[in-house]
Design a protein with these regions (language model features):
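Helix-start/capping segments and mature chain N-termini
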Residues: 1-70, 89-268
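Short secondary-structure junctions
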Residues: 73-80, 201
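Ordered, amphipathic secondary-structure segments that act as subunit-interaction surfaces
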Residues: 77-85, 95
Length: 268
């Protein structure tokens, strides 16, 4: 079941349109206990993307929220990821539906995952604009390399962001992340920065060179599906086992999630 321009359609979400023909902005967020996680932040970012592209907004924030809950009410106990996408071909088309997701296991959340670097950049990093070509390349890299995520590297050898995530690294108890001007300003990324403030951790926007990945004390990604996800290995280089700062940040972030969603309709 998905929602399209005023109608609930009894089938799974269709494939994304060809971005060469149809410009499309989108947002993806998790649904817990019949509640979308950090929905207002996602919708505000979507509207910023539309403004940066110079397109008209055919729906208000309140209208999109109302249509979203029309969909959620059809399957109130379902959990997962929902995509909201807005395309213009030739008239605006708003679609809302569940998409496949992959959440990390408990072991991955505690012990970390393997990632690899991948040389590619987003042309419009501050706009969440569908890029099918880059997504296909990163998906193939994930499959070929057998890793949880790929970290994008620019022409200067600097790590910018993940294929679906932002990334952070720790050095001498200071938290670093790539400059926001070169990445998608992730919702979870901002929550991590907020968590660092609660923990009195200093945060600096500074690139990590691909050649220096073995010099960090800790590294993790942040994103919709994974939340705060520790990294154990990069390009086959094993990182230190101590992930204490990552775990502290992860704990505070998880508290933010619980506060945001609250109890379900049954009180738990």
């Amino acid at each position: 079941m998905y929602w399209k321009n005023g109608k609930l359609i009894p089938q799974e979400f269709l494939e994304d349109p060809d971005p060469m023909l149809v410009p499309m902005v989108y947002e993806v967020f998790r649904v817990y206990r019949h509640k979308p996680l950090f929905l207002s932040e996602h919708l505000e970012r979507m509207f910023r993307s539309i403004d940066l592209l110079g397109f008209d907004k055919p729906y208000s924030l309140d209208q999109i929220q109302d249509h979203l809950f029309e969909l959620l009410d059809t399957e109130p106990d379902r959990i997962g990821n929902i995509k909201i996408r807005l395309s213009w071909w030739p008239d605006p088309i708003l679609e809302i539906g569940y998409i496949p997701h992959r959440y990390p296991t408990e072991k991955e959340q505690t012990e970390g995952v393997n990632v690899a670097t991948f040389h590619a950049v987003r042309n419009t990093p501050n706009i969440k604009l569908w890029n099918a070509a880059l997504r296909a390349r990163t998906n193939q890299a994930l499959k070929d390399l057998g890793v949880f995520e790929v970290l994008l590297v620019n022409e200067n050898g600097q790590i910018t962001e993940g294929g679906r995530t932002n990334h952070f690294y720790v050095k001498n108890s200071v938290l670093y992340t790539a400059p926001v001007s070169s990445v998608l300003p992730g919702i979870t990324r901002q929550k991590v920065i907020d968590a660092a403030g609660i923990l009195n951790l200093r945060v600096i926007e500074k690139y990590l060179l691909e050649s220096k990945v073995g010099s960090v004390d800790e590294m993790f990604t942040s994103g919709t599906s994974a939340g705060v996800q520790p990294i154990a290995m990069v390009n086959g280089i094993l990182l230190p086992e101590d992930k204490s700062i990552t775990i502290f940040v992860q704990h505070v972030y998880n508290q933010m999630v619980e506060k945001e969603i609250g109890p379900n309709n049954y009180g738990w």
